[in-house]
Amino acid sequence: MSVEIKTNTVDPIRQTYGNLQRRFGDKPASRYQEASYDIEAVTNFHYRPLWDPQHELHDPTRTAIRMTDWHKVTDPRQFYYGAYVQTRARMQEATEHAYGFCEKRELLSRLPAELQAKLLRCLVPLRHAELGANMNNSSIAGDSIAATVTQMHIYQAMDRLGMGQYLSRIGLLLDGGTGEALDQAKAYWLDDPIWQGLRRYVEDSFVIRDWFELGLAQNLVLDGLLQPLMYQRFDQWLTENGGSDVAMLTEFMRDWYGESTRWVDAMFKTVLAENDANREQVQAWLEVWEPRAYEALLPLAEEATGIAALDEVRSAFATRLQKIGLKSREE
């Protein structure tokens, strides 16, 4: 007895969804494309939001920036929800190992008292700035249009929440888990002169109505100066002064910043290339917020690293802006 097995090849009738076929042609789409393009409704809205009746739910006039299609702004990381979660899970696994190692061996509590005090005063209060960044990016995700734009900002918001929690854990490692360090860090944020400039900048950013201007003030300008200052220059100072163990607790922030700048720079390059009006508007916003961010960070830099470190960071930031197509006031 013999058994004959035949195989047939089934060719798909359609390679992809209709909206992606119209955008990219009749070919298989990537997971990122399937999860990111033409997601939100653009017609037949049921009602205008009661909290802002001047705008539709997905309204392009919430910003002064004009794009023929906001889907031109894409994520060079190709992050949709699945890819984002998998990437962060790998990063978090390494970070949790570092925190566990530090906690088990009580590395922070063994640091000299003056170094612990400096960590508590100059680093842990940043948890409040991270919450501000979380709120700002959540706001942008709510007001912006095109999922290629909104998803980048909501992922950014979740990252900032996580980074704030890591800073809180550094405080708990300093005080043995009592929470006293977090209370002290809050007092620094509210009352210490070195934090009041940054606090005012963060709180003023909460009332920026144009979501793209808010993205510039938070993700381009403030992060472009604050992140290198505290997680590169201050980390270097700690290493040179006996606090090298802290570096393993802030490695997530350094890796995250290097990744984050990719999509931020790509977004601004795309928007600036769209038309001259966009370029002029973004440059005008930059001339307002960059000097403010620099002035806000001066007292913190003077206490944490020295003002020269902030000036070096600003010079590097000016080079970054030039590559994007903008001009720093520092030049």
Swiss-Prot record:
A Pfam family: Phenol_Hydrox
Alphabetic keyword roster: Aromatic hydrocarbons catabolism, Monooxygenase, NAD, Oxidoreductase, Plasmid
Gene3D superfamilies in alphabetical order: Ribonucleotide Reductase, subunit A
Gene inactivation effect: Cells lacking this gene cannot grow on phenol.
Single GO biological process annotation from the record: aerobic phenol-containing compound catabolic process
Activity-regulation annotation: Requires DmpM for efficient turnover. The activity of DmpLNO oxygenase is inhibited by dithiothreitol (DTT) by a mechanism apparently involving H(2)O(2) generation.
Annotated GO MF terms: phenol 2-monooxygenase activity
Pathway: Aromatic compound metabolism; phenol degradation
Its EC number(s): 1.14.13.244
GO CC, one annotated term: extrachromosomal circular DNA
Catalytic activity, reaction form: phenol + NADH + O2 + H(+) = catechol + NAD(+) + H2O
Presence of keyword Oxidoreductase: yes
Highest taxon of the lineage: Bacteria
Signal peptide (residue range): none
Leading EC class: oxidoreductase
Family, as annotated: Belongs to the TmoE/XamoE family.
Subunit and partners: The multicomponent enzyme phenol hydroxylase is formed by DmpL (P1 component), DmpM (P2 component), DmpN (P3 component), DmpO (P4 component) and DmpP (P5 component). The oxygenase component is a dimer composed of three subunits, DmpL, DmpN and DmpO (DmpLNO). DmpL interacts with the auxiliary protein DmpK (P0 component).
Record function comment: Part of a multicomponent enzyme which catalyzes the degradation of phenol and some of its methylated derivatives. DmpL, DmpN and DmpO form the oxygenase component of the complex. Required for growth on phenol and for in vitro phenol hydroxylase activity.
The protein's name in its UniProt record: Phenol 2-monooxygenase, oxygenase component DmpL
Source species of the chain: Pseudomonas sp. (strain CF600)
